Amino acid sequence: MVTIRLRRTGKTKKPSYRLVVADSRAPRDGRFIEIVGHYNPVRQPKELNVKADRVRYWLGVGAQPSETVVRLLKQVGVLDADGKPAPVTPIEG
């Protein structure tokens, strides 16, 4: 099974994380398929960048996000309050 989860990076006592798509059997910091964002909880305000189009693609093909990633994706607006993909609004112009 493919999961979207956090991969720890950064220094000792100063963690930052990458949102990665990985096989569920791979170690936390091991091999991954694609980087779809990053999260830095140490900075104030907390920094969160997500490639929303790639996350929607992976969710569409069956990737399962971890509980923490679900919470972060709700903050960004990729998932709605129920944890389902939010509708995409077309950009006019």
Swiss-Prot record:
Entry annotated with the keyword DNA-binding: no
Keyword Phosphoprotein: no
Keywords: Ribonucleoprotein, Ribosomal protein
Gene3D superfamilies documented for this protein: 3.30.1320.10
InterPro entries membership: Ribosomal_bS16, Ribosomal_bS16_dom_sf
BP GO annotations: translation
Gene Ontology CC terms: cytoplasm; small ribosomal subunit
MF annotations from Gene Ontology: structural constituent of ribosome
Record-stated family: Belongs to the bacterial ribosomal protein bS16 family.
Protein name (Swiss-Prot/TrEMBL): Small ribosomal subunit protein bS16
Organism of origin: Roseiflexus castenholzii (strain DSM 13941 / HLO8)
